[in-house]
Amino acid sequence: MFENLSERLERSFKILKGEGRITEVNVAETLKDVRKALLDADVNYKVAKTFTDTVKNKAIGQDVLTSIHPSQLMVKIVHDELTALMGGETADINYEGHPAVILMSGLQGSGKTTFSSKLANYLKKKKNRNPLLVACDVYRPAAIDQLKVLGESIGVPVYSEPESKNPVQIALNAIKEAKAKSYNLVIIDTAGRLAIDEAMMQEIAAIKEAVNPTETLFVVDSMTGQDAVNTAKEFNDRLDFTGVILTKLDGDTRGGAALSIRTVVTKPIKFIGTGEKMEAIDQFHPSRMADRILGMGDVVSLVERAQEQFDEEQAKKLQRKLARNQFDFNDFLAQIEQIKKMGNIKDLLGMIPGIGKAVKDMDIDDNAFKGVEAIIRSMTPKERANPDIINNSRRERIARGSGTTLQEVNKLMKQFEQIRKTMKTVAGGKFPGMMPGMGRR
């Protein structure tokens, strides 16, 4: 996430490394580099200029303590201004109402339907809401089917009227259904288009007027950069939405949309999508995002994700087994499942301070876990519970059953032994660590 921008900014700050104090000359030189980095990241030109002008005014004339290097002070100023640029404070979503109604808008391909389901799942699990998803895309039958499949996967019902071509009436009927069946949250997925057109705008505006939503959220693909900002402005001019959702942020190495959109539309970014899984959704925290952009990681979000998957009873059981050196492949498989639920592995590593740059060019693939899982699931229950009995003939059978090679099985057995030894020494810890060699090709 934003790796290219992070690297460029880090290079810019090196200009001040050899300086004893901040001057107008070295600040100008540094900020010239910073502005170019922002523009190359597809940040809006006016936003980039205003940002660097503000940083310059705050930096020049600053008294630098002897214990603080000029480059450190510049990083602090840039961090504070990046935070302000992205909204300053975390913007909560309004889910109060009987029912609360959230209207989703955006172009086709922005990830709107998927995010509607993610949001329903998030509010159901974290805020104890009882959501109803509504399929109001009357032009694409596949969109209704997609929402139904996603809804079923998270245990959330989907209201649809496949024969109807009136999205306004569908939305109104869905709200009646929600009231009748005590759903306290309605999330309306609307039709998208490949480009903005008048008919699309009139339709979504009519739905908004009819249902009077608690929130109107604009979903945008962050990887489209400046186009995302321009589209957001057009939607906001017509819809006056209440917040922005940035999807596909895990694949965005530049960051132009995240850094520009708040200033251009004066509406907060409320949530971000960070992967394909239903759990790959985070509330947007400007300060934490500034940390990540500046290569400081985001330990708070990492710990929060771990806590979400933390099962106290399971942890106590594992701790007892570790103390007795009884860690087996059943425990190993459970740890893999926990880590997978936390999100994209490369994204997780990027949250650790100093690691983001190191993993930037690594080929880290979540699918690598599939081979490991296949090997473990090809073991008998007795073998999983007693790894020491897995001799060479058993390994050959496991390799055949899992569609892998004997070498891959041997490699996993060796890794498992290393993990077992390591985990015994840290038996008092509760945080599931990254397993040596896992996920890397």
Spans of features found by a protein language model:
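Long amphipathic alpha-helical segments used for membrane anchoring, targeting, substrate engagement
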Residues: 2-19, 288-441
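Alpha-helical scaffold segments in soluble metabolic enzymes
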Residues: 4, 11, 33, 77-84, ...
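Primarily NTPase-proximal linker/entry elements flanking Walker-type ATP/GTP-binding cores
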Residues: 8-136, 143-164, 170-190
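Residue-level signature of catalytic and energy-coupling elements of molecular machines
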Residues: 16, 42, 78, 107, ...
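Short, small-residue-enriched loops and turns at beta-alpha junctions
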Residues: 109-110, 139-141, 165-167, 192-196, ...
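Short, glycine/polar-rich helix-capping loops at beta-to-alpha or helix-loop-helix junctions
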Residues: 141-147, 228-231
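Conserved phosphate-handling catalytic cores of large alpha/beta enzymes
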Residues: 172-175, 179, 183, 195, ...
